[in-house]
Amino acid sequence: PRSRGLGDVYKRQRHGRGHFISPTKINFRANIDALKQLGVTDIVSVSAVGSLKEDLPPGKFVIVNQFIDRTFAREKTFFDDEIVAHVSMAHPTSNGLMNACEEAIKKEKIEYQRNGTYVVMEGPQFSTLAESNLYRSWKADVIGMTNMPEAKLAREAEIRYASVSMVTDFDCWHPDHENVDVQQVIKVLLGNAEKAKVMIKNLIDNFENYIDPNDPTNNCLDVAIITAPEKRTQKTIDKLKTVAGRVLNK
């Protein structure tokens, strides 16, 4: 943690130091629960992605505002036992936090695109050519393996969420570029990482100026939990106390 201004800043490496956890094996629920316990109110995801569009070359950043979730082997909700909740994911990112990200990126004159759709694939393999062309036909912008179910779980925990995706390669659809390989990704990723560090520093310095007190994420559980109170056992309420205690303990 690093103390800045009104609160602390925490960094969480999804894949662990040295990148030894595959996307499918990331414990997204534990990560979000731990951040909520620490008092985190906002998450900015920074991740490597492949590009699905000609005008999003390697090195460019995308401030994502929509997702297509193609994952199938991950725990996607905190509310999977006795207590059921249906949070809205129509707008999965927080506009104020996106504005803060954009200002931090612009300050360093990093090439970027505001708004974009991120296809989240299960992995760990890269796409087939047929899959890549399918996602392009959906008008998606980038493809990666990490933002889902992270964004959904952050919403369930009432944590505002933004995603900054760093393009490392053209996915295999591009006829004039080699098929994706790890060495190619790492080479571009190292350059992107330096830009991301500066962006994050700028973000830490100014993000609180952009937070919307009326962001629907702040109290989304008020209208999401559908299970009748008499069906909620104390054991399950206690299990959910970190992410949902605000509403379950009323």
Model region roles, listed by residue range:
Residues 22-44:
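Glycine-rich anion/phosphate-binding loops
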Residues 172-219:
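His/Asp/Glu-rich mid-to-C-terminal helical/loop segments that flank catalytic regions of hydrolases
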Residues 145-182:
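Zn-dependent metallopeptidase/amidohydrolase metal-coordination segment
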Residues 36-39, 136, 155:
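Non-catalytic positions within long, well-ordered alpha-helices that form the structural scaffold/packing
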Residues 1-6, 10:
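Single conserved hydrophobic/aromatic residue that forms the stacking wall/gate
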Residues 51-130:
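Mid-sequence, gly/pro-rich, charge-dense loop/helix-turn segments that line enzyme active sites
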Residues 221-250:
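Acidic, Ser/Thr-rich low-complexity intrinsically disordered segments
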Residues 11-24, 116, 134-137:
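Short, basic, glycine/proline-bearing loop/turn elements
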